[in-house]
Amino acid sequence: MFWHQPRQQQLRQLQRAASGAGKHQRRSPPQTLGDDGDAAAQVPPSPTGALLAFLNQHASEEGGAAAASADGRVSVSPGFCSSILPEHSQDLFAFSDPTSASPQPVPMDASLSLFTPPVPDCGRDVGEEAEGAVAPSWRAPLPAPQWRPVHGPSWWLSSSSPSGSSRGSVTSPQYSGEETSDAASGAPTPPPQSSGSSYVYGQALADLMAMIQEIPAPPRSVPDCRRGEPVSEDGMADRCETDASCYTTDEPMEAEPSEPAGGVSWLGERADRMRADQSPRGLGAEPHVAEAGRPSSCVGEERADVVAIAAVEERKEAARRSPDAERNDDEEEYESLPCAQEFFTSQELAEINARAIAESDEAEDEDAGSPAARSQSSPFPSLGPAVFVLAPTSAKSSRGMRKKAIAVSRVVPDNDGEPDPCADGPGRDHVSSAQSAGANGALETETSVPRSATAPAGAVAACAQNTKRGYWRGAAAGHAEEETDSDDEDVLVVDVSACAEPFESFAQRQQPRQQQHAPRNKPARQRLRAGAIVAAASGNTLTVPSEPPHPSLAPLWKMLNLWLSEEWPAQGGGQDEGEAAVSASLLAPGSLPELPDMCPRVAVGIISHALAVDLSAPGGRITVDEALLPKPPAADYVYYGKTGYRPSMAAHPDVRRAAEEFSASDAAARVYVEEFGMAVEQHERLVAEFMLQPLSRVSHSYGGSRLNKTEKNLCKICLPPDGGDDRDGGGKSRGGRGGGSKDASRTAMATGVPHIVHAMRDGRAALALPHLMDVIRVCRRYDASQKTYLLSCLRLAFAPLVFPGASPPVGADDSPWPTSPIRECAAALREGFRALNDIRAEQDPPADERSRELALPLDRAITAARRVAATAAGLLNAVGASVVHDGRVGLPAFFLRGVTERREDLFSAARRCPRALYSWERSMRATTAALWGHLASRGPIAAPVADLEELSQALSAVLSVTSVPDGGDVRYAFAEADEGWRALAVMLGGGAVRTSSGESGDAETDAAYALLAPGKQSSAGVNHPRGRPGRATASSPRTPASRPPHGSAAAPPSGRDSPPGALNVPEAAEEELRLAAARDTTGDLLSDEAGTDDDGDAPVVISYVGPSSPPGVEDPSPDGLAALRPLPEGYVPRPGDVLRGDPGADENDDDARAPCRVGDASPPRQLPSSSSFASSSLASAVPGDPYLPRSVAEPTLCRLAEHLQSDDGWTRAFANDPVGLAEFARRSTPGRRLGGQRRLDQLLSWTRRHSPRRRYSLIVLVSEKRPGDFRERAYAAAALAGRACVPGSACDPETWRDAEDHPSPSADAQSPLRSRPSRDCFPPRIAQPEASDDDDVGEGGTALLSAGDIGFAGAVESMLRRALSRQGQACAVVDARDDKDVLSAAAPRFPRGKPGLIYLRVAPPSEACVANLPSLGPSASPHRGVGGKHRDKRPCLAEGTPSAPSCRDAARATAPLSGDPVAHRLLMHRPAKPLVGEEACAALLGGKAGRRGQDVPLPFLTAATLRKVARVARELDPGWGHGDLGCESAVVFPPAAPPGPELADRHADRRRSTKGPQRPGGKRPRSSSSSSSASHDRSPSSSSRRRDGRPSSRRRPSRRMSARPPSRPPAAVILRASWRYAEEVAREMLDAAASRFDEADGEDPLPPAACGGKPIAPETLVALCEQRGRGPTSLPRAPTPRSGEALAAPRRSGAKDPRQGQYCPSARRSEAPHSPSPRDVALRLLERQQELNRQLLLELRRGSCEISPSPRRRDAEGRRFGCRQDDDDGYDYEGGRESPERVLGRRQSRRDSVPVRRRSGAANCGGRWMISAGRSSSSSSSSSSSSSSSPSSRPSRSATPSLSPSPSPPRRAPVDRSRSGRRRERDRPSANPFRWAPRQRSRADHSPDGTAPGDAPLNLEDGPGRGRPIWTPSSATTLPSRSGPEDSVDETETEDSAPPARLAPSPLETSRAEDSEDSEYPEYSNPRLGKSPPALKSREARRPSSKQPRRPSSGKNGHTDVSAASAFFLGRPAPGSCGRRPLGARVRGGTER
């Protein structure tokens, strides 16, 4: 609709229509406009007719009754006005108070004048842009908006019609159309229809207009302008014509106070002044106005006509109507018109006006008694004429002559509707006027004005404006050749118009006063400043202020005055300066002290027009000219590029589908096309996302965001590469998107930002934010950090526009309750501090300006300090009393009640007030008093202490919530209030000092402190001890019933730490004694001096409980007040506080009296519990916890069940948790339930996320930093799923918080999102991270609980009871709570020794989540050089992708030492500090910067940790006790380690990978770290997008880099104590494990005495658990073999061929009578190991050997080396050396001339030792590798079993991957990551069989336990041989030799073997994963087929690998079977060394 278009666009359309209509001849017949016009209808061929057509169209659109007649009148109903005023009451001019809540409505009974405002074009001429456009030059804007018609005279509204109906009529004084109906008949004529938009602006001037006083009737004749003869009105019409462009001028005017009717009478005064001042020429500073008649006392009694007098050349009426004259009018009108100066002077004008006024008086008397006049004047009276002389003008003619003229216009009414003999037509008077404007001429028009339509009853206003040649050029259309003659000349004209009343009711109210009208005296004249708008709307007089109305408008106001001063010269010019002197007098910025200032709204409107920006519009709107906008596209085209178009693709099915998805979602589209049709909505969504999301998500790269397939397809459809259609200059030539064949989705353009034309049409400045953000993004001048700064500034600048409700904090004076006692005390305190300042001002300033203490005389200082302190104490008491008083009814304090009653979301913030107000720490009381005085006075005061400013800022921030309006945004206020509360808690908690220097004050200051610590009896008769915590004063003995009604928010819990202000410091004790003495001397001060006020008001009762209660309210007792006082959140009693429920009291008395109210502190004893499990110290109470008596527990449980709306599962948990039940009762009391409902739902949200009927095998406990914060829970959920907690993902804390705001159904409800039971820990209403098929975390149920949840202890107890109730079930508790959390230290207490309970202590989850943000800037490239675009392929968080690498993968990808600078940020940490190098590694480990070399206190909560803990919990035998596991040890897989000193400031290159022909460049997918399962990396490479086009949360396999420096290679180890060394299996543990297998031994398998008090690692427990399954019942005794015979291989009935590696679960084991006992094997193993260790230590001491990394590795700075994270190789973390076990293993491997491939497991008992049964598979050391693969070299079945040192497996071939995905082997030895440098040994030192000379083979026949099968320790180590060269067995083999001895498989191995048919290692298959490890599977796939099945051995030589437990737990292939080469192996010539 036309009315909803921008203002300038409406003006442009109106001006074009008027200019186009003005080209037609005046008497041409009506024409029909084409498509380019406004309508295809009959339009009058004149500018006036064009405007009339617009008006008629608007009247018909608005539904008002409209009728047009040929005489230029349009009659409309009053509904026309009612439809205009409400819609446009604030568009241009609204005189209402901007500070009020709602703008004042425009009065409907005011006169309405329809004016068109000017086009505010700053500093340029708009007339040249459009054809016929009329626009002023605004190079000199005025301090007021100007309202003038663009063409034609002014419009006004009349409500009288000839037929007597009271319909409004819009009348034009100028209309040249033919007569189509009789004007007197009143028959309405249908208005001309127009298809275009209508235009009218009337209400703005209507507000300025008031009803004018009565003006006498016009004369019947006027004198001739040239001859001085009176001529008739129709004769005047022959030679006078009214100019179509009557403009207002800045003419001084007079105004008087409005009458009761609301009008002004200034025309009469104008006439008096003009009559008195008879200037000869009228060219001075004061123009002349003739007498306009005497003013009347009433408005609207008589009819008045506006008389226009013009001096022009007389023309013949017949000649004017001839066709020839019409043709020559345009050619001759400017040359034939002489200047107006030649016709009359100012004296003549004065005489003419005087004569007209005299005749008007005579006509008034005649018409008064005429009945016809009275009948026609009803309902509107007739008004007298208004004669107004225009300002002097000058123009420059074509002859170069400077002319001065005065333009006057006149409108003559008809003679009561009778036909005039001199007129052309019956019943009409033709009024013509012409204006001489020098050589420029004027546009001649004429009009017919019926008398009935020219009865004005409104107000008159004059607006000044300096009109430049642009207006005249538009007015004189077709005469552009003469425009250069008036470049520097100004034409000042004025237009006087009047308005009529639109409603009949107002006129009827004025009728009884018509006959009682009597003239009255004129008021005093009031001279107005030129350019000021005089308006009397509803009795308010408004003028332009001389000063800016608001400080924020001062810069704009100065600029406006500067424009005026530059454009207009100073005042004082003479008469010869022409209009310059007049302009100076009109527009000089002089002072007007006698006038009132304009309201700020008007000033804002003035500056808005001057700057072409609407400053008053809500949200800030900017008006854009319609001519600057591109044309709307055609039907089948849309906007494209800058100004181009392209064909619309709305019919495409993909586009339609994308449009439906966009309209259905609430997020912004990453690809927006014009076919969506929601450009404004997309703009708004982009603005919201930019203002709320972290800046790290904003792309800093030049290219656009990465799109998925669906979005790229949409770009391909709608954004063709050829640039689109070249229609109307669009496409590539006009800046079209894309060009050539370049993909539009990867260009620098923003695919999600719509075309800017939509934002320009909307006008809101906030919609430009996405475009500005994109401009910063694509700018290549700034880097990422600079762009972040610019975006931050952009966000700060646009914050008031996006969040208009955010307002600055206010003080106590803005309290909505002026009668609050807080306000009264604050006022008294302000007076006291003002007195202090006055005393200080009298004294000389101290010499030391740094001194903040008062330098006053002693007596005056004491008096002032006492008064201030007493007032401050009263203020604080009033605050406390307000809280107590409101606490009884459940409302906050008085000064917060008004806010919290309107906003429920503010209640939570208001409830935190008692937290600081209850804190009464003596060290800061005087500062608090000064703070309140500062807030009350809002001015700088003399601070008596040093930290006044800090406290002032804190409490100002706290009170910011009181200033939030009803509809405002409270997020900023909440954030500011939280900061204030934290600061107050620190300062008021005793952390701040009293003075800046720390010195004690004098006696006067001590007295002031004593006043604020009342220790004596107060006026209320209540004694409250307020001494130091932990110490009671002598004057206030403590009693069991006196409970301190306050709690320190910053005080630590009792029994753990001492408070910071305890009396353990001697200085504190001395200060207490000094204050006690001062308290005795000033004890009566409160009652004596502070009892009455200075003004004699009522005394202020000073007491701790506050002032007396209001009248009629019973004052409760002190005990009642103390009991009703609510406890602050997080209340913890301090040491020495006496709590209710004294332990010494009788329990019966306790229960009978029920001393503990709801929410009171509990007695320090064991809480009653009906559960035996709870009585085992799982849940215990500490002093200060909320306590609920038994009598109140049952009703509270019923109310809890109603609140939860679920079954009684969690109700039983609350029954066993009295603390949680009491907390619920305290928060759900009837008076508080309404306000705290939202917070209570958040604290009970865990009941909706967890089902009470589920068994949870993994419980994760976290701590919330602040109430309602789900950050730690979200990070724990991210760790569970192995995802990163990026903003916008399912693990985003904001998503959790939003989900909690909307209550969701219980966890039992079937939800499509709850597809897997492992997702039970997520809120049901949010998108959850997708878990891979291999992710088995939470299969048995995972729970996420916070220590701040209500019922936390009961929930943990219930979950543990249900999880451990099943036989054979274990439950793991991962405690990730913060040590600083008070609630975490209190409960729950887990039972010791509970079967099946695994308790692990880890660091908070948020400390382990990091991300790698690579730099994408130009870097040095070997191929492209420096500056070439080198894209970093390292993994990073893709923009807009919720899925991100997991914590451990992101940590591995972290490369702080890489060549390019990489920024490491802690996600969701504000502010995000970039961490590089050592700080990044320290952040990865959970430490802080600068903590290098320190131990990490706790391990991380990673996905790998949880996965292994969950697996241990499922597979561990619950019969074993693991309670001590949580004391010192935990499972940790550190993602990185801090770099060594040699690499602190250097860089490291990326680790190389194996190169192959199919993988050029060595790029092949790497497996994940050891912290993940072995099958985790075998998941197929999923796409980054799903089918629906949305980002997928699956991790994409990419190249990972390790952040391990060479000196500290971390491994997957079991950390204990100092968290630096691996777990070692002690001898006692093996003895205890072996003793368990004795049938007579029934004790605990691992008693604490056997472990020596040390904890046991879970990996060791798993291994021992496997061995325990092979007990005496499952392992029968085997026959003892003879010497030289091997053990028979165990056979199973029903099993498959054992050589195929397949076993049947029901297979039987064959007896092996001769097998050593596990105890014997372990003892011999340990003895041999100790002997080897001793030898190694001796060599190390002699210095004959050293342990150092390889020199090649040491030189390669960028390579990670050492063992992988899953290589638990016993590396010594304490000293940075290898363990002796590793040295021994390397020595043995070097003797065998075969490098060690793999290190040992967790036990670290040696190198690669294998159990060999029978003779070696090789005949000699030289032929070991060749004989291992031949069939003849297989061991004989009859070989005698023996334990001999076995060489390591042969060298593996390099791994290469073909296209089929299988690996091929090549002969390649494995590399040793560490170089062993022993002393040189000769070849003779080695025996021929490869064993050392000193090594003796192990005699299996010796020692007890013969006949038992060989027991293999679970430490993944094999037993070394003790046999020497002389005892070695013959290495030759026979075909009938016995196979090697195979160990009896454990039940765990048996279960794994069922699902691993394709693997040769059944014991290493993981049944939970459902797949075999990738390395094993690939080996099985590439092994050549053989007719004879292979034996189930892990080695090539028939040896058995027994590291199944360790390999399975670590989630990796067994040692020796890894599909990858060891970390650190180097490749040279395709062979690994």
Swiss-Prot record:
Domain of life: Viruses
Biased composition (Low complexity): 1-16, 157-173, 507-518, 1031-1056, 1169-1181, 1812-1843, 1937-1948
Subcellular location: Host nucleus
Biased composition range(s): Basic and acidic residues: 223-240, 313-326, 1294-1303, 1575-1591, 1752-1765, 1774-1795, 1853-1869
A Pfam family assignment: Herpes_ICP4_N
Ranges of Polar residues composition bias in the record: 1912-1921
Skewed-composition ranges (Gly residues): 732-741
GO annotation terms (biological process): DNA-templated viral transcription; positive regulation of DNA-templated transcription
Biased composition (Basic residues): 1592-1602
GO CC terms of this entry: host cell nucleus
Positions of region (Disordered): 1-47, 95-145, 157-199, 218-240, 277-301, 313-338, 350-461, 505-527, 719-747, 1015-1064, 1085-1186, 1294-1342, 1420-1451, 1531-1612, 1636-1655, 1664-1718, 1746-2033
Start-end of Acidic residues biased regions: 359-368, 1086-1097, 1927-1936
GO MF annotations in UniProt: DNA binding
Record InterPro entries: Herpes_ICP4_N (IPR005206)
Keywords for this protein: Activator, DNA-binding, Early protein, Host nucleus, Phosphoprotein, Transcription, Transcription regulation
Similarity comment text for this entry: Belongs to the herpesviridae ICP4 family.
Function text: This IE protein is a multifunctional protein capable of migrating to the nucleus, binding to DNA, trans-activating other viral genes, and autoregulating its own synthesis. It is required for the switch from immediate-early to early mode of gene expression.
Protein name (record): Major viral transcription factor ICP4 homolog
Organism: Psittacid herpesvirus 1 (isolate Amazon parrot/-/97-0001/1997)
